[in-house]
Amino acid sequence: HLWETWLPKKFKEKGPRVERRRLGEMLWVGGSKMYEYELDTPDAPWCDIWFYEDLVYPNKRHVAAVGFAREEMTMSPITYDEMRPGCYEPKARVEDMISNHVEASLSFPTMPRFCGQTFAEAEDRELALACVKAYNDFMVEEWCGDSNGALLPLIIIPLWDADLAAA
């Protein structure tokens, strides 16, 4: 939803997208790539996977672990259908916070990574900057906008350009 709504039309085709695919074995390789994946493995579990340039970023259960027992908090693939809506819908997030007596929350990005490294490592800088702006607009206007201060915006900056970052 974020990229379809907030990314300018000229970038939507090349921007981040989610595909539901079967995800086989994940192999730790380290570095900025982190993992190698076996995609479309027959009989492997379904997973909602982010794709952006050459990045393949599967959603993993440990990132959206709420509602799962401790022993189920694994690196296993997960779809949005299996996640609690508070993991990706701001109103549901605030409802979860209220039921857990949490006054405020700062949400860190997943696919963009904690400070936007995904876009800093991108080849297409124009697209990357558009993604940073779209993410920030979404974070301030949509994710946090109607939360009455319960959701605190955490924006990302274009790490590859000090002048753009300072602007």
Please state what every model-predicted region is.
Residues 1-167:
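Helix-coil boundary/capping segments in enzymes
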